[in-house]
Amino acid sequence: MSKEQIIQAIKGMTVLELNELVKSIEEEFGVSAAAPV
């Protein structure tokens, strides 16, 4: 899957789906996507 394909998939998602995607990525890689303050 290319970066372009990933971007196209994300563009078709709802805000709720994106939120769930971010949570899944955080859990998978043990990281947080929260911006440092």
UniProtKB/Swiss-Prot annotation:
Domain of life (superkingdom): Bacteria
GO cellular component term, pick one: ribonucleoprotein complex
Listed GO MF terms: structural constituent of ribosome
InterPro entries on file: Ribosomal_bL12_oligo, Ribosomal_bL12_oligo_N_sf
GO BP terms, alphabetized: translation
Quaternary structure annotation from Swiss-Prot or TrEMBL: Homodimer. Part of the ribosomal stalk of the 50S ribosomal subunit. Forms a multimeric L10(L12)X complex, where L10 forms an elongated spine to which 2 to 4 L12 dimers bind in a sequential fashion. Binds GTP-bound translation factors.
Function: Forms part of the ribosomal stalk which helps the ribosome interact with GTP-bound translation factors. Is thus essential for accurate translation.
Record organism: Clostridium pasteurianum
Record Gene3D superfamilies: Single helix bin (1.20.5.710)
Pfam families in alphabetical order: Ribosomal_L12_N
The protein, known as: Large ribosomal subunit protein bL12
This protein's UniProt keywords: Ribonucleoprotein, Ribosomal protein
Record family assignment: Belongs to the bacterial ribosomal protein bL12 family.
